[in-house]
Amino acid sequence: MSNHTCLITGAGGLVGSSLAEACVKGGYKVKALIRSGSDGSFLEKLGVEVVRGDLQDKNLPKEATEGVDTVFHCAAKVGDWGTVDSYRQVNVEGLRKLLDSFNPAQLYKFVHFSSLGVYEARHHHQTDESTPPPDQHFDGYTQSKMESEKLALQYHKEKGYPIVVLRPGFIYGPRDRTVLPRLMEKLKTKEVKYIGSSSYAMNNIFVGNLVQAAFLALDNPNAVGQVFNLTDGEKVSKKRFITTIAKGMNLPTPFFLPVPLWLVKFIANSMEKKALKRGALEAPKITKANIKFLGLNLDFSIEKAKRILGYAPAKTFDEGMAETLNWYKNKS
């Protein structure tokens, strides 16, 4: 039985809800911060204290931070469309507000969830944490995630906050109600095409493996002030990733579209400019941001997490995806 009291921000999402479930099993007292109007039924069934609030509010609810010594900061504005400032307001200024709600002396750990997306939008072959992310990105989400990482580490260096930064790749798992459902919808309508090479690696991580890494970071004093890349630890091609979903859900398998990457980038740039000009609220079908998912080799090293945290992914890609697809089948 743990004597820690955890605050999980973004607890209504895939990562946050999975952490809440694991924390309850581990005997932690849990406070789950979710936005007003969000469905908190899963969290309530777990028996956690559900607190409603928003990182964009002027002040966070007092009950969210009172008595808390451990924070899992999962909340973020996600997507590939919108102004940089709209993302900064949540992902950077929201983080600042959250950090300022605590005295660093009261904190055991503050685990900040970043993203492998902060690295440069290029092909990656075992890129590790010694490669610094660029200061400028072409989409608001990635730009704000890079800035929030820097802010978290600044609070560690200058104010002594016990920060750990985790950089997960593409997260999949049960209770994902956004990314995989959209991908499945596109598979149904045969909108998914491979760009570049279908053999390019994904940077995927099963949510259970990410939760495992988060708890390893929580209990390791050597993790403080560090950044960790996190994936499933095996090379999974985009073809294998998408085909596994298609076959598992009895959906059409996409075909290879031999379009050079430079042409797709040109089309994406053109579509974005037109969408911005007409003030579109929704992203065009192809954006520069989602080219990373479709057209780049995303292979990152997790040797640092293995060495310092003792991270050894508990589930393989096949096991994690089978669990994920079973959840979708039982839900529908």
Place the predicted regions along the sequence by residue.
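A conserved pocket-lining segment of Rossmann-fold NAD(P)-dependent short-chain dehydrogenase/reductase
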Residues: 132-135, 165, 185-205, 209, ...
